A protein has these predicted regions:
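C-terminal hydrophobic helical "lid"/dimerization subdomain
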Residues: 273-324
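Short, glycine/polar-rich helix-capping loops at beta-to-alpha or helix-loop-helix junctions
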Residues: 98, 179-186, 246-252
């Protein structure tokens, strides 16, 4: 089988497409013929070695994939069944989806929801799944379309762009924050009512004028601090990323004076029931147009170059990897 293999040499991560024997696949009760995978920000950190994502080498990256079960010892899945996977540490500490085959635990798989195929599932991928969990977090906090504008930071990335499309479809007024002017038309086509430059979020006071009913933040650091300072009374921020850094230079003021909620969103260890619910929502809530405008297709061998481009903020929307 062909696979993108990460190896470490003199402290550097080296990525190359290699032919591997299937016997080298890790333990698991379902072996999957992978048709599609994708490149997420975390994959880019792993492939470039820019983030301490991978501790054990050699490793096949790819934190999500979709394909067909080849063999299964799990009664919930049968040979020939379409399945998808996101999270569970796959592509980080268990060989992942950037290979023609993957072997995983049945507990980690989701049967392909009706209305999706492998390609569409990976246009959504970890990024879209995370975006849906963020939207559900805002709903759980009682944020409704009539409450006011929702701001999405890092809006041109995979999570942000899907969040814009979902929120727009659900009737919310969406304001997108992006550091790149070249993405503005794209974000408007997804449903953003207006777009703000990221440098407007560089500095903040402990409290600012109330602007946002809700927020989805993929950036962290000063951007998240500014968003918190601008939240309406009783508003909620769903935070799921650290593209701008992992620190948070904020104060307790938004929380104790404006009743603001900061809700963390993790997609890796999401329990199976919530996971299935999110995928059903994605099938129902993503407009059909999303699948045509939001994805670029690449091959396994192109993944390292595209990983660099993702780190350098040069890619908009989703990057699909055609594996088989």
């Amino acid at each position: 089988m062909q696979a993108l293999l990460l190896e470490q040499q003199d402290g550097k991560t080296l990525a190359s497409v290699q032919t591997l024997d299937e016997s080298r696949l890790p333990e698991g009760d379902v072996t999957v013929d992978v048709h599609w995978s994708s490149l997420n920000y975390k994959d880019a950190l792993a492939i470039t070695g820019k983030g301490k994502i991978i501790r054990n080498f050699p490793m096949i990256p790819g934190i999500d994939f979709a394909g067909t079960a080849r063999t299964s010892e799990d009664p919930r899945f049968h040979a020939g069944q379409e399945v998808l996977l996101t999270g569970w540490g796959v592509g980080e500490n268990h060989w992942g989806g950037l290979a023609e085959q993957a072997r995983v635990k049945g507990d980690w798989l989701v049967a392909m929801p009706q209305g999706l195929d492998a390609r569409k599932a990976m246009i959504i991928g970890t990024a879209g799944f995370t975006a849906m969990l963020c939207v559900m977090a805002l709903e759980d906090a009682g944020v409704r379309p009539q409450d006011g504008e929702i701001v999405v930071t890092g809006a041109s990335g995979g999570v942000g762009s899907t969040a814009v499309a979902l929120l727009h479809k659900l009737g919310y007024q969406v304001v997108a924050v992006s550091g790149r002017e070249s993405t503005h038309e794209y974000l408007k086509s997804l449903g953003a009512s207006r777009i703000l430059p990221r440098d407007e979020f560089a500095e903040s006071r402990p409290l600012e004028k109330q602007v946002w009913a809700g927020a989805i933040d993929t950036v962290g650091d000063k951007v998240l601090a500014k968003v918190l300072a601008q939240m309406n009374y009783g508003g909620c921020v769903a935070a799921c990323g650290l593209a701008g850094g992992f620190t948070l230079p904020t104060t307790v003021m938004p929380f104790i004076l404006r009743n603001v909620r900061l809700q963390g969103v993790d997609s890796v260890m999401t329990p199976p029931e919530r996971r299935a619910q999110a995928w059903q929502r994605l099938v129902a809530d993503l407009p059909e147009s999303f699948y045509t405008q939001a994805a670029k297709e690449i091959s396994l061998s192109e993944a390292p170059n595209f990983a660099e481009a993702i780190i350098n903020n040069q890619i908009q929307g989703r990057t699909l990897v055609k594996v088989n």
